[in-house]
Swiss-Prot record:
Required for maturation of ribosomal RNAs and formation of the large ribosomal subunit. It holds the Pfam family WD40. It comes from the Eukaryota. GO terms for molecular function: ribonucleoprotein complex binding. Belongs to the WD repeat WDR12/YTM1 family. PROSITE patterns: WD_REPEATS_1 (PS00678), WD_REPEATS_2 (PS50082), WD_REPEATS_REGION (PS50294). It is found in: Nucleus, Nucleolus; Nucleus, Nucleoplasm. Residues 227-253 are annotated as: Disordered. Residues 231-253 have a biased composition (Basic and acidic residues). Signal peptide: none annotated. HAMAP family: WDR12. Keywords: Nucleus, Repeat, Ribosome biogenesis, rRNA processing, WD repeat. This is Ribosome biogenesis protein WDR12 homolog. The lineage of its organism: Eukaryota, Metazoa, Ecdysozoa, Arthropoda, Chelicerata. It comes from Ixodes scapularis (Black-legged tick).
Length: 425
């Protein structure tokens, strides 16, 4: 295509505040997204549809559902779209850049994080858990208890006191805790035993009744999340833990809890787990597979094959899709409902090291974050596979964990002993 190519384009938007006339415009092929944004603002000014404000909004543009990151001409050539056709450009307000809010210092690697209205829960390689005040960044509590590095943490219930959360560790256990926000007292109420190696990941069911753990022992285990449950847990898999007697209390300390269900099938460490429905769980593993499990029937439903070891996954309830972190620098988008078992919907390439963690936005079906050994956390739009929206720098060593459970805050934990908080506007 020549530099002087003229392209016929129509603009449309779902945001009525910024609508412009639905007429074709002749636009130079060399026009950039920034120049298109200026054009929309000029049209808005002409039609007086623009809000009464000095600052002009910046816009992003979509062609056939993909964000425009090149000139119009380059994009059409890349996508093999004939330049003679009328190009329909959807535009939307541009996502503002995240701003750094705080850096919370730990004494060792920060390997786990989960934020809620109750506060930020973090796990450390010095075997300790921490609860932080989200608004002020002050440490509420440092909690010893595990005998090995913390691998994952998750709030279970925060609506009513006391708050409940679960932690997993290299010490082969998961622990269920209760924390009183008013008195700042914390208690370990259940020690969950059954795994034979490091317990590397955890997720809580949507109704808060159960949680599921994945381990370096290749196993997936489902547990009751009720702190007061004293029922005998009969394993549906016929394993020995299911036949044990009721939970025991030793010297008044935390009771020992056994799993409700054990699921075997992975051939290597289970590195990520997510509830995808009340009775369904997705896992990823170092064995290069994603698997979907039916925890009601106690078996595997489907398997998606990857090409590299998976290090983490995140499931979006809004779009019902999974993003995965891998040991080959790429983030991948999967549809767990696919039947052929191999379809990767999209790959996102920008990191320069292993991608250690991913997390969907809680209130957007397009945005997610990733953390990598290259020290960066990145904000992505699923419609822009070639480049992230923004890089969030600040870590001085590899990023080990990320969290975007609160819409306002994107959080990363790193091997530089820091927990970084960025605000999403």
């Amino acid at each position: 295509m020549g530099e002087t190519a003229q392209i016929q384009a129509k603009f449309f938007t779902k945001d009525e505040r910024y609508s412009v006339p639905d007429t074709p415009f002749s636009i130079a092929g060399s026009t950039t997204p920034e120049q298109l944004s200026s054009l929309i603002n000029a049209l808005l000014k002409e039609s007086s549809a623009s809000p009464d404000q000095d600052e002009q909004p910046a816009f992003d543009f979509l062609i056939n559902g993909e964000l425009l990151r090149l000139t119009l001409e380059e994009h059409l050539e890349t996508k093999e779209i004939p330049q003679e056709t009328i190009v329909h450009l959807e535009y939307l307000e541009k996502c503002p850049p995240p701003s750094p809010v705080d850096s919370l210092i730990h004494d060792d690697w920060v390997s786990a994080v989960h934020a809620s209205e109750a506060g930020i829960l973090s796990g450390c390689y010095d075997n300790t858990l921490h609860i932080w005040d989200t608004a002020t960044g002050t440490r509420r509590l440092t909690i010893p208890g595990h005998l090995g590095p913390i691998k994952s943490v998750k709030w279970v219930a925060v609506a009513e006191p006391p708050c409940t959360f679960v932690s997993t560790s290299h010490d082969e256990t998961a622990m269920l805790w209760q924390w009183d926000r008013r008195t700042n007292a914390v208690e370990s109420v259940q020690v969950c035993r059954g795994h034979a190696r490091s317990v590397d990941c955890v997720d809580v069911s949507w109704n808060g009744a159960k949680f599921v753990t994945g381990s370096f022992d290749h196993m997936l285990k489902v547990w009751s999340a009720d702190p007061d449950s004293t029922d005998t847990d009969h394993g549906q898999d016929g394993s020995e833990e299911g036949s044990r007697k009721k939970q025991k209390t030793v010297d008044g300390k935390a009771k020992t809890r056994v799993p409700v269900l054990t699921l075997a099938g992975h051939h290597e460490a289970v590195t990520g787990v997510q509830w995808t429905d009340e009775g369904e769980v997705a896992t990823c593993s170092m064995d290069h597979t994603l698997r979907i499990w039916d925890v009601e029937l106690g078996g595997m439903k489907s398997q998606l094959a990857g090409s590299k070891a998976f290090l983490g996954i995140s499931y979006s309830r809004l779009n019902r899709q999974i993003v995965s972190a891998s040991s080959d620098r790429h983030v991948r988008l999967w549809d767990p409902r696919t039947k052929d078992g191999t379809i990767v919907k999209c790959s996102y390439t920008s990191h320069a090291g292993w991608v250690s963690a991913v997390h969907w936005a809680p209130n957007s079906d397009h945005q997610f974050i990733s953390g990598s050994y290259d020290t960066l956390m990145k904000l992505w739009d699923a419609r822009s596979p070639k480049a992230p929206l923004y890089d969030m720098s600040g870590h001085e060593d590899k990023v080990l964990a990320v969290d975007w459970s609160l819409g306002k805050y994107m959080i990363s934990g790193g091997a530089d002993n820091q927990l970084k908080i960025f605000e999403h506007k």
